[in-house]
């Protein structure tokens, strides 16, 4: 009975993406899930067979509700399975294999770059006539104008070991022969277009790319129409050589020739637009392609999905994906398609959907797909920031080995990011030791400031034992100085000792910060300083935060430099006021506000991003309101209404709540007017 599920139930199942029947297949190894699916289908068999329209609609509603309940149960089961897994841990053999494979990948890449890319001619046979052979310079004959050579004569002329066709030919030689051809006026006159396509199919793509526009011009001058096959060959060659601007030029020339649209031409053009970052043009091309009766190719649709992802048009990307799954008859989503959609899930902060897509591509009943390194890298990225899925993200390293995939530099980047957000300090130290201290691989993948950002992020996320007594900042700095001065080896960006307690963590953070100041002072931008301060803010170490703010921040604020160092000051003020708000330290927060305002009034700060200033003002409004200084908060709010900022109930909600508690009806009315009425800013601007 389960195998005969049909009719409207099937349509509903498709609308729910494969419905209970396919979910039954996906979860066939889980007894709990399969029982749920069987019960769901059996309970609705009778309802499906109803002939009364009213009862049929009611049955559909019931089925829809049960499907939603079923999906929720599947979701709960999945989350329970995730939570039951072992703590974040990578088996030693998997970790060792990962380190060695990344090292071997890097060495192979270096060897490839050092040997160069000597592209040889293609292995396809050269099937062209003697006239074109003569003009190319491959066939020597007194009667160069004749095209009546016998096949045996051509073969005997080409059989000599010294001829171009019977030995490996350098790119320079092919370029020379192609220039010889293109220098002849109307060089393709009298030559069949099929022979021309065969000839260019034989040449290396770099040679074709270099002269692609001249080839187009020569074909037109010879009085021939450019066939789509030849255009696609030219565009594929320019794309393969990375000369995407020539691909765009070729497409525009093709448009001017009033030639009919071609799916492969669209595909090559889409790849070029995607590579050039012209995502808006690619979105327009997608609309143009839909208006013509041409079935799009898989590569074209993948390029469109990538464009919609870059332009943040995620709804359209899902439409293309669903078209490939449900509507298109000759194409279906590839592993690359799933990788791109997982990337979109990451942008939409939906790790659960990303994991569903990964399972779907592996378990779909028809043509299941094998994951690629690209897919797994994107899935690690999507899962890394959500604590619920970090165990699953680490287990993906085993999937790489299971499917015979090799990690690459992107895998290393995603793993460092995952380690940072999961707080696995031992793994972070191991990676830094292998790929930064022993060999300088990391700086070629990440900027130095990104590496420090991930180190600080790992220190924020790490789980350690709380220390009963925390020494002051001076004590930590003195200990760090002793470690640095007594070290006989070159400095490394982390302490090798284990980090078991909060004091160990603080010592490691201060050591890394001192290392960055000494070795990479140019990397200490606004993000890193706030990351460093955020370690103590997140740990609730108010006293250490204050000491670092007073000593390190003041020290940096006197440094001469660019607006980046000014942004550093502004962001640090934000963190100082935020700490005062969280830990009820009004004096510290108000002093930080006054210092910021002093620098701003006396123009000690260059013009900065408006969002920074608004953030400082909003935090100060909350700080004043929380400490019952509502009149000061109202004055501060009124003085900034002419800034053109967006005010809403969320940003002013805390201030309104505190003013309501204080029975300050004037300020409550002011906030309600600002957040509810259009043009209210004109009423409350300064005279």
From Swiss-Prot:
Effect of inactivating the gene: Impairs growth on galactose and leads to thermosensitivity on glucose-containing media.
Keywords associated with the record: Mitochondrion, mRNA processing, mRNA splicing, Repeat, Transit peptide
UniProt cross-references to Gene3D superfamilies, sorted A to Z: Tetratricopeptide repeat domain
Gene Ontology BP annotations: mitochondrial gene expression; mRNA processing; RNA splicing
Gene Ontology CC entries for this record: mitochondrial matrix; mitochondrion
Cell compartments where the protein resides: Mitochondrion
Record has Mitochondrion as a keyword: yes
Transit peptide, UniProt annotation: 1-49
PPR repeat placement: 262-296, 297-331, 334-368, 372-407
Task of the protein: Regulates mitochondrial small subunit maturation by controlling 15S rRNA 5'-end processing. Localizes to the 5' precursor of the 15S rRNA in a position that is subsequently occupied by mS47 in the mature yeast mtSSU. Uses structure and sequence-specific RNA recognition, binding to a single-stranded region of the precursor and specifically recognizing bases -6 to -1. The exchange of Ccm1 for mS47 is coupled to the irreversible removal of precursor rRNA that is accompanied by conformational changes of the mitoribosomal proteins uS5m and mS26.
Miscellaneous remark of the record: Involved in mitochondrial-nuclear incompatibility, a major determinant in reproductive isolation between species, through hybrid incompatibility of Ccm1 and its interacting partner 15S rRNA between yeast species.
Family, similarity comment: Belongs to the CCM1 family.
Subunit note: Binds to mitochondrial small subunit 15S rRNA.
Protein name, per record: Mitochondrial 15S rRNA processing factor ppr3
């Amino acid at each position: 009975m389960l195998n005969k599920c049909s009719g409207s139930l099937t349509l509903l199942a498709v609308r729910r993406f494969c419905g209970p029947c396919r979910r039954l297949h996906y979860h066939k190894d889980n007894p709990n899930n399969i029982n749920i699916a069987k019960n769901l289908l059996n309970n609705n068999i009778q309802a499906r067979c109803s002939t009364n329209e009213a009862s049929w609609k009611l049955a559909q509603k019931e089925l829809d509700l049960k499907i939603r309940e079923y999906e929720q149960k599947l979701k709960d089961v999945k989350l329970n399975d995730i939570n039951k897994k072992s703590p974040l841990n990578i088996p030693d053999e998997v970790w060792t294999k990962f380190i060695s494979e990344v090292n071997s990948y890097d060495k192979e890449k270096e060897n490839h770059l050092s040997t160069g890319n000597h592209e040889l001619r293609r292995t396809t046979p050269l099937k062209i006539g003697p006239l074109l052979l003569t003009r190319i310079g491959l066939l020597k004959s007194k009667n160069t104008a004749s095209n009546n050579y016998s096949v045996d004569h051509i073969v005997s002329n080409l059989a000599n070991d010294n001829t171009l066709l019977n030995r490996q030919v350098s790119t320079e030689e092919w370029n020379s022969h192609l220039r010889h051809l293109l220098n002849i006026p109307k060089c393709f006159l009298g030559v069949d277009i099929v022979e021309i396509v065969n000839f260019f199919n034989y040449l290396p793509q770099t040679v074709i790319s270099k002269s692609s526009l001249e080839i187009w011009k020569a074909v037109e001058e010879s009085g021939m129409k450019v066939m789509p096959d030849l255009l696609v060959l030219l565009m594929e060659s320019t794309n393969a050589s990375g000369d995407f601007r020539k691909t765009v030029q070729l497409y525009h020339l093709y448009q001017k020739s009033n030639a009919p649209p071609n799916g492969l031409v669209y595909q090559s053009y889409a790849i070029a637009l995607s590579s050039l970052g012209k995502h808006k043009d690619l979105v327009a091309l997608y609309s143009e392609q839909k208006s013509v009766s041409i079935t799009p190719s898989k590569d074209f649709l993948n390029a469109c999905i990538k464009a919609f992802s870059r332009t943040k048009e995620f709804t359209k990307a899902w439409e293309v994906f669903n078209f490939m799954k449900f509507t298109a008859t000759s194409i279906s989503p590839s592993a690359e398609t799933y990788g791109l959609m997982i990337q979109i899930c990451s942008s939409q902060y939906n790790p659960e959907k990303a994991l569903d897509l990964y399972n779907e591509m592996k378990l779909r009943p028809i043509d299941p797909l094998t994951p690629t390194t690209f897919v797994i890298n994107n899935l690690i990225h999507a899962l890394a920031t959500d604590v619920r899925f970090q165990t699953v993200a680490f287990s993906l390293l085993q999937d790489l080995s299971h499917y015979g995939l090799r990690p690459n530099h992107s895998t290393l980047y995603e793993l460092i990011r995952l380690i940072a957000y999961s707080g696995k300090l031992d793994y972070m130290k191991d990676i830094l030791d292998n790929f930064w201290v022993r060999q300088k691989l990391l700086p070629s993948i990440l900027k130095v400031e990104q590496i420090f950002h991930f180190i600080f992020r790992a220190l924020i996320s790490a789980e350690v034992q709380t220390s009963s007594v925390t020494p002051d900042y001076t004590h930590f700095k003195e200990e760090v100085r002793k470690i640095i001065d007594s070290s006989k080896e070159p400095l490394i960006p982390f302490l090798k000792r284990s980090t078991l307690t909060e004091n160990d963590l603080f010592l490691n953070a201060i050591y890394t910060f001192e290392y960055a100041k000494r070795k990479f002072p140019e990397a200490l931008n606004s993000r890193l300083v706030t990351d460093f301060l955020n370690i103590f803010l997140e740990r609730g170490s108010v006293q250490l935060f204050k000491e670092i703010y007073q000593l390190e921040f003041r020290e940096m604020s006197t440094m001469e430099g660019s607006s980046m160092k000014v942004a550093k000051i502004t962001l640090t003020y934000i963190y100082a006021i935020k700490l005062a708000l969280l830990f009820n330290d009004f004096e510290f927060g108000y002093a930080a506000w006054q210092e910021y305002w002093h620098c701003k009034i006396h123009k000690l700060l260059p013009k900065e991003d408006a969002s920074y200033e608004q953030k400082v003002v909003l935090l100060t409004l909350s700080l004043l309101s929380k400490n019952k200084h509502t009149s000061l908060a109202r004055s501060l709010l009124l003085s900034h209404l002419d800034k053109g900022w967006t005010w809403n109930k969320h940003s002013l909600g805390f201030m309104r709540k505190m003013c309501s508690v204080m029975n300050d009806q004037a300020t409550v009315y002011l906030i309600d007017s600002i957040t509810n009425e259009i043009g209210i800013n004109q009423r409350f601007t300064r005279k």
